[in-house]
Amino acid sequence: MRKKQGRLTIVKQTEVARDSYELVLEGELVKHMSQPGQFLHVRVDESEDLLLRRPISIANIDPEKEQVTMIYRAGGAGTKRLAAQRVGTEVDVLGPLGQGFPLEEAKRGEEVLLVGGGIGVPPLYYLGRRLVENGARVTSVLGFASQADVFYEQPFKQLGNVHIATADGSYGAPGFVTDVISQQSLDFDVLYSCGPTPMLKALTARYRERRAFISLEERMGCGVGACFACVCHVENGQAHEYRKICTDGPVFPVGEVVL
Ligand SMILES: Cc1cc2nc3c(=O)[nH]c(=O)nc-3n(C[C@H](O)[C@H](O)[C@H](O)COP(=O)(O)OP(=O)(O)OC[C@H]3O[C@@H](n4cnc5c(N)ncnc54)[C@H](O)[C@@H]3O)c2cc1C
Ligand code: FES
């Protein structure tokens, strides 16, 4: 597939939780974006010291306005630089990249469980919107470190039932998303998840035999299949069998790759 790259203009940049920003970009490149779970590779600014792009998931798309929303945590040098960019600034974006969540796996009327942790929550919002449009019934379980980190509870509530968990117990249920799933006896036809590796490992251990899909947000370099920084091994595969998270993923069927 031909690489897509363009300059998008910042039309909104708001802090939605502690050190977490909702960034809305506008421009022609957005017309190529439609698959939930794909990501954009963002050049945070034009300075020489931050040449490496940062991968950030698509959290929402408004095709009519040609706007894409991302939600990111400003944790390191690059994302902090991005958070300092103001409305009206142009940002260099490569994408959409990767293989997103398979929407067709959830049929009309089926129960879908969205399980997100921290910066893994954003791509599940656009996924949930598309699933609801397709007639699936969506329940979301969203985990955060603390109350100050919680974002997008209301938008998710518009899609269906929402359960929030915080690790320190300051909001919602105390503990992890997996605790909530057990306590509430939540079941599903299809599960989609994105979040930290320990969470994805726990879900894989439980739901290996189920219709479940996980998105990996851990390792990335070039974003386009050229550098091998994102390689992961296939479960029970030969030593030479691998997948590239950037081009084969970031979404994989549960149990396909070694976490
Ligand atoms: C497919 C994908 C989707 C993602 N979606 C989101 C999202 O929607 N919201 C969000 O907040 N974060 C997301 N991330 C994580 C985000 O890319 C990292 O938090 C970010 O790159 C860290 O950059 P930094 O400038 O804060 O840190 P720095 O420490 O300055 O980063 C240094 C280098 O390491 C890389 N790096 C560091 N941590 C990560 C990481 N966890 N994943 C990938 N590369 C990393 C950076 O890209 C950069 O090249 C996603 C990651 C991937 C792979
Ligand atoms: S990030 Fe370079 S090959 Fe995947």
Curated annotation (Swiss-Prot):
Subunit structure: Heterotetramer of 2 PyrK and 2 PyrD type B subunits.
Organism: Shouchella clausii (strain KSM-K16) (Alkalihalobacillus clausii)
Binding site for [2Fe-2S] cluster: 222, 227, 230, 246
Keywords tagged on the record: 2Fe-2S, Electron transport, FAD, Flavoprotein, Iron, Iron-sulfur, Metal-binding, Pyrimidine biosynthesis, Transport
MF-aspect GO terms: 2 iron, 2 sulfur cluster binding; electron transfer activity; flavin adenine dinucleotide binding; metal ion binding; oxidoreductase activity
NCBIfam families associated with the record: PRK00054.1-2, PRK00054.1-4
S-S pairs: none
Its biological purpose: Responsible for channeling the electrons from the oxidation of dihydroorotate from the FMN redox center in the PyrD type B subunit to the ultimate electron acceptor NAD(+).
UniProt GO BP: 'de novo' UMP biosynthetic process
Cofactor or coenzyme needed: [2Fe-2S] cluster; FAD
PROSITE patterns: FAD_FR
Family indicated by similarity: Belongs to the PyrK family.
Cofactor note: Binds 1 [2Fe-2S] cluster per subunit. Binds 1 FAD per subunit.
Protein name, per record: Dihydroorotate dehydrogenase B (NAD(+)), electron transfer subunit
Start and end residues of each FAD-binding FR-type domain: 3-103
Phylogenetic placement of the source organism: Bacteria, Bacillati, Bacillota, Bacilli, Bacillales
Chain positions recorded as FAD binding sites: 54-57, 71-73, 78-79
Pathway in which this enzyme or protein is active: Pyrimidine metabolism; UMP biosynthesis via de novo pathway; orotate from (S)-dihydroorotate (NAD(+) route): step 1/1
